[in-house]
């Protein structure tokens, strides 16, 4: 493999044995592609905004004399960029402008004669835009729209599993689900009649539906039944024989062949052998006794030819009398319905008998009554209602997916078709459910991923936009029908408010629009790849059963079987598997390698769950010989959702990678294959809660996916094009682009601005640091700067800690963790949290609030950190209770005494009219002010601080743009100088030229002269562009802010809090091994090895066996080897050994392992590169052990040998307190530990006096309400058991809800009297009132 200059800085040793056929696709593509389809103009009009417009327009007036047509749309440019939107608290969106055409038709002339056409561009609200990282900025906060897994439109057949009826009989049902419109259900009842329901309302016999579709009784019978033909003879009947129909029946008469010999005697059961005999003898007719026909049903009406009287009506039961009537009337032939108990049920026949309607109108009226109970039906209303239910494109749409699923399920060859239902569709569904009831077909599995599809951002936004358009449509139609249209323009007809409101509602408050989890890069990526079955049109937690939540065979390679939340949402919220993607229909697909005649090719095909069932698919870990053939004869594979063994020749596809089945979070767990699934689930979920540490450190033992994840998450800065690093500082990187990657006529400079110390959604700190230096070569895709939780472009969620598995004085009882003081001293788990505190000055009824440093009754010391405007300085260190922003609020005028009036008249004392409502630091917080933002309403005078901040921003913008301009100008000038050198100018001449004159030289060579002129033009454009950009920036900074009504000013203060690790903080490894820190132990007391090196953390070995997450033990051994190799390299460098020796050792490390795919050609590295690599490996060599394809025990032992460590992985340890050796050896190594965002500082809380609940008068609960501790029922029992009567009494009275008692208590304490008199608890009064409300009077007597 070829490594770029920056990749050579540190190479992760990979133990993967399988060749890489396919790289993990871009992780955020599910979000970005979906939204791109929504906003991109689609000429076919099948998706996105275009589809929404085409589905609603043209809008015709009621009279048909005018219509509003849609022509095209365009999205404008957003006013503010993403960062500005976040600071100002506005939505990152672009204005949508639509070109509409109003056509007026001439009433007097022939139909369709156009009288007037008006075209105009109309503003239709703002559409939120997606940022490059797949998020939306809504009101200043980053949000993610989670994709939804919902039941695909189409037709589904199911049964009730015998739960509906007491007999336990299985009742089948069919349901046609459209994308939008009414649901149509068919279901059997316990008596085997077929019923229909529309939108889950009252059920009607299914034949009513057929009658409404203009089928007569005769046609219905012909559709659903075969006939049995009889010829009527004098005493007998002759039946046309279809031998197959007799199978399984008991003969009620002798069955004879054509010659008259008896084949089956009366009373015998007819078997397949008998049927073969009948077929052999070519018997086509069979004489049956007259009684045989009794109880059969007529297949048609029989009419007396003379009188016209109906002798036997269709579907009526035939009796001997009926037969006699038919003979008398001279009717010689009779047809009955072919029905048998086994596989030709009388379902439709029975249904017809309970159907009270006889014609179409009656059926329509019946449906109307069911849909609109209480309304008088008219013929037109009933027809219109039925037509609109399933046959109107405006009200009903199966969608392309629905039609495809519908046709495939009913074996209709074409995948395309109408979006509405046809008569034939409904009949086909009824035939199919009867087919299933007869036992010829199976019901569907609704949890199969072929029956559930993904609805992503673009599709949901399109649906919401359509909802808004439909609201507008009604208003437009009314306006077109009213008023004089000659005066109106399209602008006057359209009101953009409903559209904006629908879109805003979706992005702001939909259940699937979620506040982005921004703890670390992994949590961001996982949140964007989340698939939820909840939300509008989905399931609800309460109703979702076990089956829906369970892992289904079709999840393989599509949804991760590991990563899902614990708790009520388990299995309803899933994560996309690493390689999965959605197809054009929204079904999940996963890639497979094609296998042709037993040879595995590198051709990759994506298969959906439906397609996968048809093929035989082998796993990725099968043995492959040198020719790319399968080495074994019998191969473990999957076919039709079952695991089985098949011959190598039968295999059609093979997995692309062993990591294919799991999500990115799960594939970050090394040695995942050795962990129990429950613990792996916790490990995957807890990595998302890791807080970025002060100095990120890459994991020594990783899985090789760390880099992909860090790059795709968007937190690191990646080079867009190759070149050389020209300039680096903490906030900007400049890359000079390679000549061959330049676009014509550009300066050839890429400038990357870095994000510095900004706040994330979870209050963690986002900060980017450059990881390249000037002069370094860069190729496209190289990491230039690290973000939070990344280290040289690798994801780094925690720290590598030296761990010992041993008990230590009970401090690691029940998963507690003992850590060394050194960990805290070295700031290994110190994290920075940034809090945003806001102070809002409003306009009140009594006057405006004012932000000022002049606050009544506050001492000088409290104001020492404020400037003259009353706002805290940047850099000030503040603690709980300090004033950040001084604010005074007008108080109501109180009635003054004459003396006060006199004093006020003399001294002009007015300060008592305002009260102090300043913004203070919350009690438990202590930190440093890192930024202040002041927003002032338009028209309100800006205070001095606001002006200063504004000037600072303008100066910063001028400096930034100026430097950018200078860099780009230098790029142009250097190219011009190169031209002049080529034209014969000497270096000295060029050096003597002033900068501005370089571009106005005259050259003899015409082409070069033209190039020089082009460069001069470019320079002018740059200058003009700079002025324009600066003007826009200046206008943005100085313009007033758009604040909420009644708000004059908002001051936002950003406070950085440094949190070191302390007892009570939660920590975890990557294998679900979590615990709380119990004690920070002095370094000298920690166990140490023979070299005197103490361990950092002591974990309880009892946490491993019962949890079955052995991966952590292997990680510790591998970590020890990796660190040991790093220590060896360090020793070599410190002893200044020969570089060849260092190179040889590093080469030995990278070549270790059996059949390892990775090849690192250390020999091709220059000495400088080897030295730099060695320096970066001093902390330990990073290792990749991919899930299901990782390092084996043998390789871990080889690594330990290379590191010069015992292959047992265990060391002698000594007790730090006594110096004695522990009685047996201890497993010591390096584990990657995470600090989770469950910090004791956020949870610890104490209450003195605070708020009480209004009804019970008891203290509230929880930190947010400054509440107390609940002393519950069991705690009361505990005190009762100890006989602590007085403690119990005060707990239940004065410390809780005895209102008078607690006031008296306070007074007593103030007076120094420590007595207490408990009274009646308020909750007892509540109980009395409750009992009285039930009508039972209780009165209290004085004792």
From Swiss-Prot:
Any one cellular-component term (Gene Ontology): DNA-directed RNA polymerase complex
Enzyme class: transferase
Catalysed reactions, as listed in the record: RNA(n) + a ribonucleoside 5'-triphosphate = RNA(n+1) + diphosphate
One BP term from GO: DNA-templated transcription
EC numbers: 2.7.7.6
Matching CDD domains: RNA_pol_B_RPB2
Keyword vocabulary terms for this entry: DNA-directed RNA polymerase, Nucleotidyltransferase, Transcription, Transferase
Gene Ontology MF term list: DNA binding; DNA-directed RNA polymerase activity; ribonucleoside binding
Subunit structure: The RNAP catalytic core consists of 2 alpha, 1 beta, 1 beta' and 1 omega subunit. When a sigma factor is associated with the core the holoenzyme is formed, which can initiate transcription.
General function of this protein: DNA-dependent RNA polymerase catalyzes the transcription of DNA into RNA using the four ribonucleoside triphosphates as substrates.
HAMAP family assigned: RNApol_bact_RpoB
Similarity field: Belongs to the RNA polymerase beta chain family.
Name of protein: DNA-directed RNA polymerase subunit beta
Species assigned in the record: Shewanella baltica (strain OS223)
């Amino acid at each position: 493999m070829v490594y770029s200059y920056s990749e050579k800085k540190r190479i992760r040793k990979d133990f993967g044995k399988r060749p890489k056929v396919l790289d993990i696709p871009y992780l955020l593509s599910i979000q970005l592609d979906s939204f791109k389809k929504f906003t991109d103009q689609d000429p076919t009009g099948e998706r996105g905004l275009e589809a929404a417009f085409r589905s609603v327009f043209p809008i015709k007036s009621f009279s048909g004399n005018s219509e509003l047509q849609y022509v095209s749309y365009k999205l404008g440019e957003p006013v503010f960029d993403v960062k500005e939107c976040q600071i100002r608290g506005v939505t990152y969106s672009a204005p949508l402008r639509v070109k509409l055409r109003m056509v007026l038709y001439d009433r007097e002339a022939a139909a369709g004669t156009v009288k007037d056409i008006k075209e105009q561009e109309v503003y239709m609200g703002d559409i939120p835009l997606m940022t490059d990282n797949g998020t939306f900025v809504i009101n200043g906060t980053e949000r993610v729209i989670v994709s939804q897994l919902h039941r695909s439109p189409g037709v589904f057949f199911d049964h009730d599993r015998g739960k509906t009826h007491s007999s336990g009989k299985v009742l089948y049902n069919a349901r046609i689900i459209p994308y939008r419109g009414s649901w149509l259900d068919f279901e059997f009842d316990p008596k085997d009649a077929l019923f229909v329901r529309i939108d889950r309302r009252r059920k009607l016999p299914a034949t009513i539906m057929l009658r409404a579709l203009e089928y007569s009784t005769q046609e219905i019978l012909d559709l659903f039944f075969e006939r049995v033909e009889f010829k009527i003879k004098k005493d007998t009947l002759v039946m046309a024989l279809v031998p197959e129909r007799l199978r399984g029946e008991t003969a009620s008469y002798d069955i004879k062949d054509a010659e008259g010999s008896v084949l089956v005697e009366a009373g015998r059961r007819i078997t397949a052998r008998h049927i073969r005999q009948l077929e052999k003898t070519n018997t086509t007719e069979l004489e049956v006794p007259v009684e045989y026909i009794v109880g059969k049903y007529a297949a048609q009406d029989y009419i007396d030819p003379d009188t016209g009287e109906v002798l036997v009506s269709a579907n009526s039961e035939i009796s001997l009398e009926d037969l006699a009537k038919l003979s008398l009337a001279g009717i010689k032939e009779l047809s009955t319905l072919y029905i048998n108990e086994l596989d030709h049920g009388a379902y439709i026949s029975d249904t017809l008998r309970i159907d009270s309607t006889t014609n179409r109108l009656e059926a329509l009226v019946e449906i109307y009554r069911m849909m609109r109970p209480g309304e008088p039906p008219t013929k037109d209303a009933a027809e219109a209602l039925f037509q609109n239910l399933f046959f109107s494109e405006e009200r009903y749409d199966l969608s392309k997916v629905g039609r495809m699923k519908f046709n495939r399920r009913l074996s209709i060859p074409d995948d395309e078709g109408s979006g509405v239902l046809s008569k034939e569709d409904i009949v086909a569904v009824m035939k199919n459910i009867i087919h299933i009831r007869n036992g010829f077909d199976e019901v569907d599995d609704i949890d199969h991923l072929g029956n559930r599809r993904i609805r992503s951002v673009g599709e949901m936004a399109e649906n919401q936009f359509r909802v808004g358009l439909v609201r507008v449509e009604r208003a437009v139609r009314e306006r077109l029908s009213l008023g004089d249209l000659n005066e109106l323009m399209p602008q006057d007809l359209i009101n953009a408010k409903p559209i904006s409101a629908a879109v805003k509602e979706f992005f702001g408050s939909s259940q699937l629009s979620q506040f982005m989890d921004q703890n670390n890069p992994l949590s961001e990526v996982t949140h964007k790849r989340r698939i939820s079955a909840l939300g509008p049109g989905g399931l609800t937690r309460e109703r979702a059963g076990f089956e829906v939540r369970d892992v289904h065979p079709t999840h393989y390679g599509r949804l991760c079987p590991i990563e899902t939340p614990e708790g009520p949402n388990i299995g309803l919220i899933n994560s996309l598997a690493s390689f999965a993607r959605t197809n054009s229909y929204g079904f999940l697909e996963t890639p497979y390698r094609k296998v042709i005649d037993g040879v595995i090719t590198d051709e990759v095909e994506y298969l959906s769950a439906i397609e996968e069932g048809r093929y035989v698919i082998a796993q990725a870990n099968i043995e492959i010989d040198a020719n790319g053939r399968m080495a074994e004869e019998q191969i473990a594979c999957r076919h039709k959702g079952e695991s089985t063994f098949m011959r190598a020749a039968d295999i059609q596809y093979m997995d692309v990678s062993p990591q294919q089945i799991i999500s990115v979070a799960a594939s970050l767990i090394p040695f995942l294959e050795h962990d129990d699934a429950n613990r792996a689930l916790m490990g995957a979920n807890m990595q998302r809660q890791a807080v970025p540490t002060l100095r990120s450190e890459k994991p020594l033992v990783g899985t090789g996916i760390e880099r992909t994840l860090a790059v795709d998450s968007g937190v690191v800065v990646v080079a867009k094009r190759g070149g050389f690093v020209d300039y680096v500082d903490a906030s900007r990187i400049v890359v000079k682009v390679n000549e061959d990657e330049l676009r014509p006529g550009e300066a050839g400079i890429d400038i990357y601005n870095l994000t510095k110390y900004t706040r994330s959604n979870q209050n963690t700190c986002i900060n980017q640091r450059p990881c390249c230096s000037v002069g370094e070569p860069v190729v496209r895709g190289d990491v230039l700067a690290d973000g939070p939780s990344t280290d040289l472009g690798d994801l780094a969620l925690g720290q590598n800690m030296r761990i010992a598995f041993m008990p230590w004085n009970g401090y690691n009882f029940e998963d507690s963790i003992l850590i060394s003081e050194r960990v805290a001293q070295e700031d290994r788990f110190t994290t920075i949290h940034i809090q945003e505190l806001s102070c809002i000055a409003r306009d009140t009824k009594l006057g405006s609030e004012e932000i000022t440093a002049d606050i009544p009754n506050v001492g000088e010391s409290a104001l020492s950190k404020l400037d003259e405007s009353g706002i805290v300085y940047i850099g000030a260190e503040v603690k709980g209770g300090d004033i950040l922003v001084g604010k005074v609020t007008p108080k109501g005028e109180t009635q003054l005494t004459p003396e006060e009036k006199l004093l006020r008249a003399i001294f002009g004392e007015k300060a008592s009219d305002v009260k102090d409502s300043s913004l203070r630091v919350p009690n438990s917080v202590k930190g440093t002010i890192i930024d202040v933002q002041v927003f002032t309403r338009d028209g309100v005078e800006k205070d001095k601080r606001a002006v200063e901040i504004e000037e600072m921003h303008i100066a910063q913008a001028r400096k930034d743009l100026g430097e950018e301009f200078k860099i780009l100008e230098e790029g142009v000038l250097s190219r011009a100088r190169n031209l002049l050198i080529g034209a014969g100018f000497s270096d000295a001449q060029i050096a003597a030229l002033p900068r501005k004159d370089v571009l106005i030289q005259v050259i003899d060579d015409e082409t070069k002269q033209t190039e020089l002129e082009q460069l001069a033009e470019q320079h002018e454009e740059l200058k003009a562009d700079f002025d324009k950009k600066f003007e826009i920036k200046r206008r943005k900074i100085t313009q007033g802010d758009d604040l909420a009504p009644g708000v004059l000013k908002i001051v936002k203060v950003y406070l950085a809090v440094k949190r070191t690790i302390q007892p009570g903080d939660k920590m975890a490894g990557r294998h679900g091994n979590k615990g709380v820190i119990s004690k920070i132990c002095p370094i000298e007391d920690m166990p140490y090895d023979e070299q005197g090196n103490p361990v950092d953390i002591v974990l309880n070995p009892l946490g491993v066996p019962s949890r079955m997450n052995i991966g952590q033990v292997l990680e510790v051994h591998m970590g020890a080897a990796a660190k040991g190799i790093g220590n060896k390299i360090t020793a070599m460098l410190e002893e200044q050994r020969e570089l060849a020796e260092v190179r040889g050792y590093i080469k030995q490390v990278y070549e270790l392992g059996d059949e390892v795919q990775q090849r690192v050609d250390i020999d091709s590295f220059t000495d400088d590169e080897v030295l730099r690599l060695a320096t970066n490996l001093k902390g330990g060599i990073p290792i990749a052990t991919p899930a299901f394809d990782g390092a084996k025990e043998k390789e871990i032992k080889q690594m330990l040998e290379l590191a010069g460590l015992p292959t047992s992985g265990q060391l002698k340890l000594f007790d730090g307190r006594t110096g004695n050796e522990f009685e047996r050896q201890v497993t010591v190594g390096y584990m990657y530990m995470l600090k989770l965002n469950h910090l004791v500082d956020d949870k610890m809380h104490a209450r003195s006096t605070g708020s009480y609940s209004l009804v019970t008068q008891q203290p509230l609960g929880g930190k947010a309400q400054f509440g107390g501790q609940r002393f519950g029922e069991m705690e009361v029992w505990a005190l009762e058991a100890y006989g602590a009567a007085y403690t119990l009494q005060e707990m239940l009275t004065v410390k809780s809800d005895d209102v008078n008692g607690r006031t008296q208590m306070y007074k007593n304490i103030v007076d120094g009297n420590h007595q207490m008199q408990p009274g009646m608890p308020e909750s007892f009064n509540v109980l009395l009132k409750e009992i009285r409300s039930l009508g039972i009077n209780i009165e209290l007597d004085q004792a």
